[in-house]
Regions:
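Conserved small/polar residues in nucleotide/adenosyl-binding loops
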Residues: 250-253
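Function-dense linear segments that define catalytic or interfacial modules
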Residues: 39-119
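Intrinsically disordered, low-complexity acidic Ser/Thr-rich regulatory segments
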Residues: 122-138
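Structured alpha-helical segments in the cores of large, soluble enzyme domains
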Residues: 85, 89, 134-156, 173-192
C-alpha cells in the first residue's frame, strides 16, 4: 500500500500538469493504475506466435520451437507467465486457435505414424490418432487453467490473462476452440463441485460470414453458445459490420 501511494505521488509530481491534477481532485478524470505507470507498461497484446517461430531466448535459456502440441502448451504457459509478471494490467494472447494449429498438426502426424507402426488398419489408425489428439488438446487447456489460476506474480496477484479464438476453419483450429470451450464449460475442482475458473478470460471472435447458419464454423459457434449457457463465458466480439471492433480487427489483420 505504501509503495502504491508513493508511486501515485511521484507520478503526479513528475508527469502531470497542475490542470490535470486539479481535474483528478475534482473527479473530472481518472487515471487507471497510476501506481504502476512509472515502472512498466500497462496491458499488452502479445505476439506468442512470432515468439515461438524458430525458437527464442527467455531467462538466459534458449527454447527451441515446440515439435508437439503438449510441448507447445507448456512453453506458451511459461512465456505468458514470465511476460505477464513483468507488466501491469491485462495480458492478451490473440488467436490461440491459430497459434496451436501447426503444433496440433505435428502431433497428429506423429500419432498416425505411431499407430501405423503397430500394424493397425488405416481406419483404426485414424480413429485412435484423432482421439489421442483430442485428449492432448483437452489436457493442454486444463493445464493452462490450473497454471494461470494458481501461479501468482511477484506482486502477489494473478495476471489478468485473456485469449481470443474462433475464426480458424482448419480441423486443428476448430478443435482448439471447441476443446477450450468444453474445458471451461466443464470447470475445475473436486467431482461434484466443479466450477469455471477465471483465467484465461476467453473472447470469442464472431464473424457472421464464418459462424452463421450453414457456414463453416457454425459448430464452433454452437459450442460457444453452449459454454455461455452454463458458465457466462466466453465474452463475445463481433467482427461483422462497420463498428469499431470489426474495423479495427480488419485493419490489424
Amino acid at each position: 500500500l505504501i509503495f502504491n501511494e508513493l508511486n501515485k505521488e511521484l507520478y503526479k509530481k513528475f508527469f502531470l500538469t497542475v490542470e490535470e491534477i486539479q481535474a483528478i481532485r475534482e473527479g473530472y478524470i481518472y487515471i487507471h493504475d497510476m501506481s504502476a505507470r512509472r515502472d512498466t507498461m500497462n496491458c499488452c497484446l502479445f505476439d506468442v506466435k512470432n515468439v515461438l517461430s524458430g525458437g527464442f531466448e527467455m531467462g538466459n535459456l534458449w527454447y527451441n520451437e515446440p515439435k508437439t502440441l503438449d510441448t507447445a502448451f507448456d512453453v506458451i504457459g511459461d512465456i505468458v507467465l514470465s511476460a505477464a509478471s513483468q507488466q501491469y494490467g491485462g495480458f492478451t494472447v490473440p488467436s490461440v486457435d491459430e497459434i496451436l494449429e501447426p503444433y496440433a498438426e505435428k502431433s497428429h502426424k506423429k500419432l498416425i505414424e505411431k499407430y501405423r507402426g503397430l500394424g493397425l488398419d488405416e481406419e483404426t489408425v485414424q480413429k485412435v490418432a484423432w482421439a489421442d489428439l483430442e485428449k492432448e488438446m483437452e489436457q493442454g487447456f486444463q493445464g493452462w487453467e490450473y497454471k494461470f489460476n494458481s501461479v501468482s506474480s511477484s506482486r502477489g496477484d494473478y495476471p489478468f490473462i485473456t485469449v481470443t479464438a474462433g475464426t480458424r476453419t482448419s480441423i486443428y483450429g476448430k478443435l482448439a476452440t471447441i476443446k477450450m470451450l468444453e474445458v471451461r464449460k466443464n470447470g475445475q475442482g473436486k467431482d461434484g463441485h466443479k466450477k469455471p475458473v477465471l483465467f484465461p478470460k476467453i473472447v470469442f471472435l464472431y464473424d457472421e460470414n464464418l459462424h452463421g447458419p450453414g457456414k463453416p464454423l457454425e459448430d464452433v459457434f454452437e459450442a460457444g453458445i453452449e459454454c455461455s449457457r452454463k458458465t457466462m463465458y466466453p465474452d463475445w466480439l463481433s467482427l461483422t459490420g462497420d463498428g469499431y471492433v470489426p474495423v479495427s480487427y480488419t485493419h490489424l489483420t
